[in-house]
Amino acid sequence: MTSSSSPGISLKMEGISYAAGAELPVVIINVMRGGPGLGNIEPAQGDYFQATKGGGHGDYRLIVLAPWGPQEFADMTGEAFELADFYRIPVMVLADGLVGQMMEPVVFRDPPRRELPPKDWALTGAEGRAARRVVSFYIGAGVLAEHCRKLRAKYDRIESCETRSVETDVTGADLALV
């Protein structure tokens, strides 16, 4: 897990891209602030595209959860660990700076549990088994393209299974923009 606000997240983008390429479960908290550049510490939503379109180099995506208040922030942070572990993907909890500055009591609930796949990728020592490597550098004809196809299939599955939204005041609307 790591956390920061806007410019700090930008500095972490190479590592986040590496984690996505290596399929490492990581939770990232980004409490957005004003920008561009160093900006200010006022609430802002300027990191939306960076988070949702893959802010570092390469063909990758993150799962992005965006809480609207402190309780949902607490709930989504717990859920982020489950999602990261289940899909082997970085998950970003992306909060407006205003949410990051709010104070109210929260209840730390257990997130919905999933049956997790075996961690046969984890580096736990090689005693009694073949060595494992965590990489995001793929060399050789077609190796990277095949890896990107595998990741794309995962992203499509996540989009199909995990996309969610809250509808407010849309009854009777012909069109709703998200």
Where in the sequence are the language-model features?
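Generic secondary-structure signature for well-ordered alpha-helical cores
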Residues: 17-25, 31-34, 53-57, 75-89, ...
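Short glycine/serine/threonine-rich phosphate/pyrophosphate-binding segments
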Residues: 3, 8-14, 37, 73-76
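A short, small-residue-rich loop immediately preceding and capping a beta-strand
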Residues: 1-12, 21-30, 66, 176-178
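Conserved thiamine diphosphate
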Residues: 43-97
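A glycine- and small-aliphatic-rich helix-loop capping segment at beta-alpha/alpha-beta transitions
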Residues: 15-26, 42-52, 107-114
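Thiamine diphosphate
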Residues: 41-44, 50, 57-59, 152-178
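A glycine-rich helix N-cap at a beta->alpha junction
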Residues: 24-35, 114-123
